[in-house]
Amino acid sequence: METKIFAHRGARWCRPENTLASFQQALREKADGIELDVHLSKDNELIVIHDETVNRTTNAKGFVHDLTLSQLKTLDAGCNFKLQASSPLLTFIQRFRSLLIKKIYTHEKIPTLGEVLDFLEANNFTGCLNIEVKTDHIHYPDIETILSEEMVQRELSFTYLYSSFNFRSVELLHELEPTVDLAYLTYNNQNEIERGLEADFITALHPKKSYALSKHFESSRKPLRVWTVNAERDIKKLLTKNVAAIITDYPEKARRIRKQCQK
């Protein structure tokens, strides 16, 4: 079984995370899957952003659920971007590149989920879209229903799955879409892992990398898609364990390593 490579918030090592620019780069790097995060705006639009607030990734402050879509669309989702250094020796060069890239992607906008779906369709994406429902800190009323309605109305060229740290959100999505692929996100809490393994409707676990890399871990009854795996040694080790997928900020690098390790 070939381990799939999922682009974490797109190719966020070199583009502003969870933006169309980041997803475009993930397609260029030939990621097998793309992972993104969804929240609800004040006017119940599905917003693709990781944090509960816009503070870290934009030029404004405030909670996503306190802002309307039109307000969110005025924000700059590229202004705080910094290129991730993959090697200390390349830091100076990458800082220079980061300044150039930041200039290019300043004024990048926060997308809606609908815009991302349209973009992936227009670019003939045929992989898997991992939609993380961000209800672990704030539970948005009816987000699961709004999300499911958005997805089932479309005839997509690609597959999709839902994931969440919130067990109840995963349950609700199963009730709405009984045959959809559902993943339970976990840290290293063994009780959470067992809960995910025992629930029949959960088809996969998305554990933190330290769990899958642990010497105590040998195999799992369900597929594992492991997050967030960026170091070459960790990618290689997980490839030897034949996990279902690696979720990484560096999809092209991970694909290159996979080619070497899983011939």
Regions found by a protein language model. Name each.
Residues M1-K263:
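Phosphate-group recognition and catalysis centered on beta-loop-alpha active-site segments
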